[in-house]
Every structure is written in C-alpha cells, then in structure tokens.
A protein has these predicted regions:
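Transmembrane alpha-helical segments of polytopic membrane transport and secretion proteins
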Residues: 1-29, 268-285
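Hydrophobic alpha-helical transmembrane segments of membrane transport/permease proteins
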Residues: 26, 30-69, 223-231
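Generic hydrophobic transmembrane alpha-helix motif, especially the helices
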Residues: 63, 67, 97-99, 107-169, ...
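Transmembrane alpha-helix signature in integral membrane proteins
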Residues: 73-108, 262
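Transmembrane alpha-helices
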Residues: 82-98, 127, 133, 187-219, ...
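Glycine-rich helix-loop "coupling/hinge" segments at transmembrane-helix boundaries
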Residues: 137-139, 151, 166-167, 215-258, ...
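C-terminal transmembrane helix and the adjacent membrane-cytosol boundary/short C-terminal tail
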Residues: 154, 200-210, 249-285
Length: 285
C-alpha cells in the first residue's frame, strides 16, 4: 500500500515537472523566435534616427518610447535580442564543449596533464569571475567577440570539473572495463561509453549557466567593454540611458526588463531540466 502511494506521488511530481518543462521550453522557444525574426517584426528600423522625436515617452506610436536620437526603443530592444541571446548561447556552447573535452581527457588519462589543468582551473575559480573577465576585456578592448572571449577564458573550468568527476566515476565501471577487454581503444571508449553518459550533467550545467552568462555579458557591455554604440544590445542600451535614468527612465527600464525576463525564463528552464533529469524522479517516467 505504501509503495503504491509512493509511486503515485512520484508520478504526480513527474507530471508537474513535465508541464513546467513544456511551458518553459515554449517560452524559451518564443524568445529565440523573436530574436531570429526580429528584423521582420519591428515597426521601425533600430538605427533609424529622427531628432524631432527625441526622448518621447512610451505611447501607442512608440510602445517603449524613443532615445536621445529619436530611435524607437521597442525596435531596438527586440533587435537587441539577437546580439544578447545569440552571443550568450554561443558563449555557453563554446565553454561547455571545451570544458567537457578537457575535463573528460583529464579524468580518463590523469597524470601530469590532469594536475596542470586542475591547477589552472583552481586559479580561474579563485578569482571572482566578473572581475577576472573585466581585466581580460579591458586588455582586449571593446566588442561583443572580445567580451565573449573574456568570459570564456574564466568560465570553462566548471564544465571541466563536472566532466572530470563523472569520467573518474565511469572509468572504473564494469561496462567500461568490458569495452577495454573487447579491444576498444581509449578514444573509442571515451566517445562511445563515457561522453554519452556525462552529457546529462553537462546539459544541466549549461542550461543553468545561460542566465548567468547573459547577465555577465550585459554587465561588460554596460561598462563599455562589450557591445559598442550604436549596436542594439541590452547592456549597451542600459549604459546609454543611465545618465538620464531619473528623467527618462524608459531608456534603462526597457532593456533592463528584457534582460530580467530572459534570465528568469532560462533560469527556470534550467531548474526544471535539472529536476527532470534527477535520478530520484527516474522511476516515475
């Protein structure tokens, strides 16, 4: 009887997680579609200037008002999703692939390479990430590409550590030992038996990392170390309006709300993916 109740509770919990996962996947897909088709859905050109309409408040004609050059803020926020979201996804993709590859090789082969890489990752993790990224971005100069590179340099160790710990656990497992006895090479064992089994934790880490990386990229742009004017990018737009926050608050609030909404959606999606892949819920699938 107790086992039946437990199974029912697990199924109810799993169904709720599935509903949440579907909802947040739809919301994330909607954000991506807006970014992809931004140029086709905006009412005005994001870089079209009209000084006669400078600093207009939100209205039926300009839903989020205009900036100091008369550019429509709604159009710039929507088009800014392309730079803000795609650069974030590119960053997370690069650091997850690189970190996973490095961590897997270190965990499998060990030795001097493992010691050196882990010491490098310790150094990267010892500093506050954004402070380290600020120093690197300042040396590289402004630009979205340089901001992505600066954050990539200090963000890959978390993936390397996850991949390394998972690889160490799998390396001594029975099915890997059987594959070794069957004559598989080291690279075959990594590609066929280890990587497929560590992708789950890596995926969860990457999903949870999207919101953080988006805020850090926006932070670098806000400090003029990322996207440069007149690029429509959320952090850069907030930087351009900060001096007029008290008199023309929509200049900061509009891109700020876009960042807030995107980060919340991706964070909740990451949390839900983590819950869905939790082994405690596997029996109810």
């Amino acid at each position: 009887m107790n086992e039946t109740v437990t199974v029912r509770v697990q199924k109810v919990r799993k169904n709720r997680i599935r509903i949440r996962l579907t909802l947040f996947l739809i919301l994330a897909a909607a954000l991506l579609l807006v970014a992809i088709f931004a140029d086709k859905i905006v009412p005005y050109g994001p870089y079209a200037q009209d000084l006669s309409k400078s600093l207009l408040p939100p209205s039926a004609e300009h839903w989020m008002g205009t900036d100091r050059y008369g550019r429509d803020m709604f159009s710039r926020v929507v088009v800014g999703a392309q730079t803000s979201i795609f650069s974030t996804l590119a960053l997370v993709g690069v650091i997850s692939v690189f970190g996973t590859a490095v961590g897997t090789l270190c965990g499998y082969y060990g030795g001097a390479m493992d010691s050196v890489v882990m010491r490098i990752s310790d150094v990267c993790l010892a500093f506050p990430g954004l402070v380290f990224a600020l120093a690197i971005a300042a040396m590289l100069g402004g630009g979205v590409g340089n901001a992505v590179l600066a954050l990539a340099v200090i963000s890959w160790p978390k993936y390397a550590r996850v991949a390394r710990s998972q690889t160490l656990a799998l390396k001594s497992s029975g099915f890997v030992a059987a594959a070794r006895l069957s004559g598989d090479s080291s690279m075959q064992m990594i590609l066929r038996h280890i990587l497929p089994n560590i992708l789950g934790p890596i995926l969860v880490t990457a999903m949870l990392d999207i919101g953080t990386m988006m805020m850090e990229l926006a932070g670098l742009s806000f400090l003029n170390l990322g996207a440069q004017p007149p690029t429509a990018e959320w952090g850069n737009m907030m930087s351009g309006g900060r001096s007029m926050l008290q008199t023309y608050p929509w200049l900061v609030l509009s891109p700020g709300f876009a960042i807030f909404l995107s980060v919340v959606i991706f964070n909740l999606l990451g949390d839900t993916v983590r819950d869905y892949m939790d082994p405690k819920n596997s029996r109810a699938r």
